[in-house]
């Protein structure tokens, strides 16, 4: 029963597709009540429909991570529906720029940092106090192995994800004394719509598959299970950490 989430309420941003959808589905399968959120309500409702078809419980709430008021509404809607929030998964992110840093415009970089870093801090400050009052909670940020390496294509995105890892360590120091576990997941290249520009590029995909110990890129469910671990009793002593789930790219020694 170490992975049982029965009675827990999980809020997942970017939950309508890819990694976020898998996290929603896997947490529901392990007993959690799930609040599925992304910008587009119909896409969230489709995920909810699938969860309910398998006997799970979920609701859909549209929210953009770029808008603090919408995130406040998301948190309020979750509390109204289920009374509390036990698990917060910050999966939503944006990467509007693919190319060298020489072509990166300042406003685009600011948007990346606001969406990918500041929104996570907003959410922690929204849900942290109630978790602290109960002395129980799991706060998970989906980062990326891009946080650990340089890139000629998505450097701005990588910088934001590196900032998330630093944020996790600091939040863990602030909130850990209240038994709130703050952790990150760093996925490798996952076959999602978000990463389509990477895995549809034969050279980039081939390089990743060659470097990976498992010789493949990842699938969304490869990450969903990691999130369940961090949210459950199985991860009760894990705090301030980043779990790398990349098929063995980082640390493989491949050049």
Sequence positions of predicted segments:
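Residue(s) in the substrate-gating loop at a strand-loop-helix junction
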Residues: 144
């Amino acid at each position: 029963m170490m992975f049982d989430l029965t009675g827990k309420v999980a809020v997942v941003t970017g939950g309508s597709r890819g990694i976020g959808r898998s996290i929603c589905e896997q947490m529901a399968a392990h007993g959690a009540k799930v609040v599925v959120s992304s910008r587009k309500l119909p896409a969230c409702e489709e995920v909810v429909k699938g969860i309910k078809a398998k006997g799970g419980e979920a609701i859909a709430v549209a929210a953009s991570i770029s808008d603090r008021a919408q995130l406040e509404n998301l948190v309020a809607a979750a509390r109204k529906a289920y009374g509390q929030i036990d698990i917060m998964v910050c999966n939503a992110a944006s990467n509007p720029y693919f190319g060298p840093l020489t072509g990166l415009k300042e406003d685009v970089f600011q948007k990346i940092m606001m969406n990918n870093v500041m929104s996570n801090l907003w959410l922690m400050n929204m849900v942290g106090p109630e978790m602290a009052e109960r002395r129980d909670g799991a706060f998970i940020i989906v980062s990326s192995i891009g946080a650990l390496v340089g890139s000629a294509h998505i450097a701005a995105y990588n910088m934001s994800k590196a900032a998330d890892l630093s944020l996790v360590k600091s939040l863990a120091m602030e909130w850990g004394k209240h038994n709130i576990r703050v952790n990150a997941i760093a996925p490798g290249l996952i076959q999602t719509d978000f990463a389509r520009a990477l895995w549809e590029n034969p050279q980039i995909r081939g390089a990743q598959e060659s470097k990976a110990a498992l010789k493949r890129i990842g699938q969304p469910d490869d990450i969903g299970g990691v999130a369940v671990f961090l949210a459950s009793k199985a991860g009760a002593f894990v705090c301030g950490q980043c779990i790398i789930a990349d098929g063995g790219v980082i640390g493989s020694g491949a050049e």
